[in-house]
Amino acid sequence: MNRIHAVILDWAGTTVDFGSFAPTQIFVEAFRQAFDVEITLAEARVPMGLGKWQHIEALGKLPAVDARWQAKFGRSMSAADIDAIYAAFMPLQIAKVVDFSSPIAGVIDTIAALRAEGIKIGSCSGYPRAVMERLVPAAAEHGYRPDHWVATDDLAAGGRPGPWMALQNVIALGIDAVAHCVKVDDAAPGISEGLNAGMWTVGLAVSGNEFGATWDAYQTMSKEDVAVRREHAASKLYAAGAHYVVDSLADLPEVIAHINARLAQGERP
């Protein structure tokens, strides 16, 4: 049948951890612990969506971070430096990720609605397997149980922005065509992942990394501040190539209905 058969969902900022705070704060702590180098939370957010080693590498290439590194060590960050920061990052992230495992508002109901339509739920993450092995059962205790999940270090080909994790979900879920899949993510590398896999892509402008607010802060934010942050996030996600941008996963069923109508007319991603 010419309709959406599966959605492939990101984790932090998409289905759990409103604002994607679990990984960002840990990057700040890992830089400090490994080398006593300060980075800001805003800087930590810039490469979000990549695998965590690649994320650290990208942070080291940010001009402001590189300038601080050069001032302290007289050189740019090396692969060995990245390894050391990653080694500090991993135990911190494994210890903290369970604290950020609660599903974002609307996720459980949305998943139930999608499954009622016969849609399978795949997922993938920039987290490595060691972190996912803590996060997945913790999220399950809160009621979120995707049909499949893939970690960023599971596949020899690599992670985002390549298509491989998304395509591994297609294989595992037995989906007949990538055009019948939707990749949902709150960060640009995850949108690129979906596009590279030949899928429809939906960006989340409020629940995730680009908006960058806690749920409590979002609830008390002025309409003007919400609008400014939403526009900032949406512009980045559209620039990455997202077919649609909505606030959160709660808005996905309406988007899927729209995509199904386009598929019925013979359109493809």
Curated annotation (Swiss-Prot):
The active site is at 10 (nucleophile), 52 (schiff-base intermediate with substrate). Its cofactor is Mg(2+). Binds 1 Mg(2+) ion per subunit. Its EC number is 3.11.1.1. Pfam families: Hydrolase. GO terms for biological process: DNA repair; organic phosphonate catabolic process. It comes from the Bacteria. One of its GO terms (molecular function) is magnesium ion binding. The keyword Membrane does not apply. Mg(2+) binds at residues 10, 12, 186. Homodimer. NCBIfam families: HAD-SF-IA-v3, phosphonatase. PANTHER family: PHOSPHOGLYCOLATE PHOSPHATASE, PHOSPHONOACETALDEHYDE HYDROLASE. Involved in phosphonate degradation. This is Phosphonoacetaldehyde hydrolase. It comes from Salmonella paratyphi B (strain ATCC BAA-1250 / SPB7). The gene is phnX.
